[in-house]
């Protein structure tokens, strides 16, 4: 009974050997999960035969439990794939194999827009099509919106064949613009576990999740080294937070007309204890993927609130310091209550710490609308960051109470181009018509600053005036 309570021993076959002839003992042991019961006197050949029989039954049961099919797609499940892939590679050790991981991008959004039935149709379509075009492949549904394929490597043109498969799947999809990302691990190392082989294909796939130009990525040693570095950064996160290795830097925002500082944006930098700096481009996307960004967002928010409290206590001039809020933080439970409490504990006006939401994070939905309304009701001012990079800008401006929009650098870069000038002129006019201020970010040239001044842009942020500075320098 105690053995069955132990998760390590729960699946181990148990044969009870006893000198008791009482049948109730035998019945009780079998009820508790014993695989067999051997009374005295022991016959060596009988005991050995029964042990072998129990082992074979256990192995057969394990194989049967692994051979399970996904109800929706009819494909193998993840556990079944692990089992059969291992058997196949052991059966043909001289064959070269590739593992392909396929991920349906924005699958939750597809379900929300088209409905769950269409989402299910897409999954069934992918299952059927992959089986059709990869006839020698072992295919499984790996997770809700991911598929895994083990296929033998052709001697030539594997990458070309892979491109043809991807094109066929895309062109025959049940909805237009279906986006599937593929991670491929070629010539798999058979000395490592099936799960690790799949992990390498997943690494490749994740490396292009934000790259809209590329749908196929291949695992290589460089990607493996990058994964090791990312794991080390994740492992270092707790100590870095505890030891305050994360520093808040500031990039000033300048009043276009007076050319004086009118505010700043808080940015994060990571200075390790040995003095080396970790690039934000390395750790921020990583922490956004694994969810650690929510704690980093709160860390920055607390630091800025403390700085604003110190400035106000010392009688220094007031100006707002905006804080970026990630998509993950926006959906984090208790966000409004927590951030409101931090502001009140520092006894500062909410106007001191406006919140910047990227255009993609603020993409309109009922949930986002409710959350934004709660932030505004608490007293926060909201800025739309990266305006012009997404497709929901006008909808968001119409229904969400933003006070400021920040023109993305990609728009500013087109200043001097006739159509680019027209777009910026009309966006500024639109924002002012909605009683919103406009901040242009990424301004690097005198000509850009002069144009924005003529267009009555409110504030400028960029290297033309100042790069991000540490707090002491700022």
Question: Which residue stretches match the model-derived regions?
Answer:
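GGDEF/GGEEF active-site signature
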Residues: 125-189, 196
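Active-site core of bacterial EAL-family cyclic-dinucleotide phosphodiesterase domains
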Residues: 84, 229-286, 324, 384, ...
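Conserved long alpha-helical elements within nucleotide-processing catalytic cores of c-di-GMP signaling
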Residues: 68, 74-98, 105-132, 140-149, ...
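C-di-GMP signaling machinery
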Residues: 60, 79, 91, 194, ...
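Alpha4 helix (beta4-alpha4-beta5 surface) of REC/receiver domains from two-component response regulators
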Residues: 5, 10, 21-36
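A short glycine-enriched loop-to-beta-strand structural element that forms part of the catalytic core
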Residues: 98, 144-146, 150, 174-208, ...
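EAL-family c-di-GMP phosphodiesterase catalytic domain
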Residues: 273, 326-333, 352-365, 378-474
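Catalytic core of bacterial c-di-GMP phosphodiesterases, primarily the EAL and HD-GYP domains
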Residues: 179, 258-265, 290-370, 442
